[in-house]
């Protein structure tokens, strides 16, 4: 999907780029697969802010996505490619032979009318989902489960792909987009191919208002706050931080590694991601 530029008729138009939505085939979602989505503005169930800089934005409907891909042996035909406001990738509506409809994350190269399949017997073809033990090494994959049957958790955003490197014992070595090499149980499922909407990384938001449409609020620097609000705050006029950079809660920031060394999944990481 290519990006579209505009003539600089105003400062807000000058750098904006948008997707041309060439792959999208319909504008309305499948009603049976849509749910209401209530805005949280970064708050948890206690009403406390757990994610800063969230709030407002355009109203959205949630599209129920099939991340488990557990409809084994039933062929499905791609009916539409659709825009999803809740993720960077596009989604595809699949009509299965038994009459059921499901949304999946649309891989790059998936076309309307194409047939896809799930299960150990599926072919190594873009859009098909198989356990890692049935996928040959070297193949690009996405939508990977961390635990068998729990649904895809990693490599789901636009343009993302991982590579199955090798199989050893009960685990597969997978190189993730970050460069990290991690072990996944061989019974975990993955989808063949790269996530679609590859040009998403080239999109420039271009103006503050467009960020607000997406529900992103401004990020205020700690150094311009008062001491009561941030460890970097205070001082007369423009003053340096005066200490190693920290988060608003006093934890080391800007490059300091914060992963817990005792985390159980650390033993599954063969090689850490590159900086």
Swiss-Prot record:
**InterPro entries noted in UniProt:** NA-bd_OB-fold, Rib_uL2_dom2, Ribosomal_uL2, Ribosomal_uL2_bac/org-type, Ribosomal_uL2_C, Ribosomal_uL2_CS, Ribosomal_uL2_dom3, Ribosomal_uL2_RNA-bd_dom
Q: Which SMART domains match?
A: Ribosomal_L2 (SM01383), Ribosomal_L2_C (SM01382)
Q: Where is this region: Disordered?
A: 225-275
In the record, biological process GO terms are:
cytoplasmic translation
Q: Does the keyword Hydrolase apply?
A: no
Report the domain of life of the source organism.
Answer: Bacteria
One of the record's GO cellular component terms: large ribosomal subunit
Biased composition annotated in UniProt, kind: Basic residues: 258-275
- Molecular functions per Gene Ontology: rRNA binding; structural constituent of ribosome; transferase activity
Q: Which Pfam families match?
A: Ribosomal_L2 (PF00181), Ribosomal_L2_C (PF03947)
Q: Which UniProt keywords apply?
A: Ribonucleoprotein, Ribosomal protein, RNA-binding, rRNA-binding
Q: How does it assemble?
A: Part of the 50S ribosomal subunit. Forms a bridge to the 30S subunit in the 70S ribosome.
Q: What does this protein do?
A: One of the primary rRNA binding proteins. Required for association of the 30S and 50S subunits to form the 70S ribosome, for tRNA binding and peptide bond formation. It has been suggested to have peptidyltransferase activity; this is somewhat controversial. Makes several contacts with the 16S rRNA in the 70S ribosome.
Q: Which family does it belong to?
A: Belongs to the universal ribosomal protein uL2 family.
Q: Spell out the protein name for this chain.
A: Large ribosomal subunit protein uL2
Whose protein is this, by species?
Desulforudis audaxviator (strain MP104C)
In the UniProt record, the gene name given for this protein reads rplB
